[in-house]
Amino acid sequence: MRRTLLTKAMEMMASGLTPSVAELAEAAEVSRATAYRYFPTQSALVAAVVDESLGPILEWKSESGDAVSRVDELLLHAFPRMEEYEVQLRAAILVSLQQGAQARAGKGGGEEPLVRGHRIELLSSAASPLRDKLGEERFQRVLRALSLVYGTEVFLVLKDIWHLDIEEILQTVRWTAQAILRHASTDD
């Protein structure tokens, strides 16, 4: 049943809807109780859709011992997947932004916030050959810098504001990541 609900949610999001759990139940023709059993909140639903959309990215591994190659592999692997599931990822950002605005306005509905964040672990894995060379403080700075060139937000800025296609997006993020890593290796 979870798979059926998740598939329906992905279909709804692909058509531009960000369903509540109740709306998903209605569209999937199951009881609300059933839908809420699998997805107690909209955040849980959206998080499941994001995990499903990004699945192969989250399982990414590299055999290379070189940080520049590893980061490059991650970018080449991840950004086409982001393009493929762009609508679902936009929905996740929308929910996250709405929850943040409501919380800041003191109107949080008590729903657990949508927590996005596989970025740190993926970038940490990709850049891991630098950890011992740089030391923990500099390594963390490199991860923070790389987080500015990796992720859905970066994809959307380059697509929506700069009107780049996927090849141009990849050229831009790869060039920037290489510059960050080059600088990190020479920064004293």
What does each of the following model-derived ranges do?
Residues 3, 7, 76, 80, ...:
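Generic detection of well-ordered alpha-helical segments
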Residues 29-39:
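Short hydrophobic/aromatic patch on the recognition helix
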Residues 84, 100-144, 171-179:
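Amphipathic alpha-helical packing segments from all-alpha helical-bundle domains
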Residues 41-46:
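Short amphipathic alpha-helical segment with a characteristic S/N-K-E followed by hydrophobic residues
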Residues 1-23, 27:
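Short, amphipathic alpha-helix enriched in basic
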Residues 10-18, 47-77:
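Amphipathic alpha-helical linker/stalk segments
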Residues 129-176, 184-188:
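Hydrophobic/aromatic-rich alpha-helical bundle segments in the mid-to-C-terminal region
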Residues 71-104, 110-114:
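Helical hydrophobic small-molecule/effector-binding pocket
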